Amino acid sequence: MAKKGALTGLLLFGIFFGAGNLIFPPSLGALSGEHFLPAIAGFVFSGVGIAVLTLIIGTLNPKGYIYEISTKIAPWFATLYLSVLYLSIGPFFAIPRTATTAYEVGISPLLSDANKGLGLIVFTLLYFAAAYLISLNPSKILDRIGRVLTPVFAILIVILVVLGAFKYGGTSPQAASAAYQASAFGTGFLEGYNTLDALASVAFSVIAVQTLKQLGFSSKKEYISTIWVVGIVVALAFSALYIGLGFLGNHFPVPAEAMKGGTPGVYILSQATQEIFGSTAQLFLAAMVTVTCFTTTVGLIVSTAEFFNGRFPQISYKVYATVFTLIGFAIANLGLSAIIKYSIPVLVILYPITIAIVMIVIVNKFVALSKPGMQLTIAVVTAIAIASVLGSSFKVEFLANLVNVLPFAKASLPWLVPAIVGILLSLVLPNKQESDVFEMD
């Protein structure tokens, strides 16, 4: 049980941990200053806690989120929501973003300006070709990522963090930004959303279930116990690296110019690597970032292709993997800024819906909930999320004003209280539904 859980946990940690997970903790460390401890606590609580909880809930029932959403909300909504989610964190946004980030942080500094355009094409071609070849045989993903690539990038990050702690641990933190001075834990909590790992947890729960099935279980009790081991392994690995990278950022001397953009993480990683490793710095950084991003890319190709093949089996897994890899390759060559610009509104809509679904599933594990009440809750949260994006990103003023009167709107959580009210109503509305008790195949 422990071995199965540890192996699956390492696989999922390797797939989850991408470039964003490298950049955000040192940024938080630099910006939080003397308020680092409550800030990193908030970051770990949201960036690790919500993601791991979403993952555990998705794997406690081997039928996965597609079944949970279909039975609690509606089959058509499950298909629509999960299709948009997988396409967003898959070929249209996250897959190309991992490749472009790996290139811009790790490879681009090694090239002259004249060769950077061609360099991106060549790098992404080789990058996606390798990811595609591994993804063609998803049954081998545990061996190829969990046992090989994950230890490689984890060791590289640990080396940087440990050497950085010895070199800069005695340096005093800089003054905290206004946001962290006002609410260190709250700001850190909201920064944890930037990892978007709660969305990825929905997708990667498919890989978790498939991997666990391959390992085989003699009873439901063993399966459930192993899932908790998986969650503990993922949580501990994430927390340790987040705290280490945050500590590095907290003590690394960052000039005022680098702090102005509000995200000094890239600067800290680059400069700390150069100062620690000297002439070999860029090669070390290139290896660390590329391997980190690559594991995420493979996991996203596999999980997205498996979802669509399971939902629309008329098309083979191989065709889906091929198409999604080609789309990722094409979009990656648009550049990182373009990918981030177009992805943010979609992800901001998906995140509240995902958390609301997880809240419903958790509560329903313990008490019966009204199906109309659950449907109403998701409908209201979806409407608020869409209104928030239209109001903030597309400047629809009357929608922005409506959203801003809701509790916690200033904390970017206008949907939270309506979601809680909806779940409370589901306790008293008719047509109650018990959570299904799954049986092992």
Residue locations for each model-derived region?
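Membrane-water interface regions at transmembrane-helix termini and the short interhelical loops
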Residues: 60-64, 68, 127-149, 214-217, ...
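Membrane-interface loop-to-helix entry segments
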Residues: 135-164, 343-355, 374-382
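Hydrophobic, small-residue-rich membrane helices and short re-entrant helix-turn-helix hairpins
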Residues: 137-148, 185, 208-237, 255-267, ...
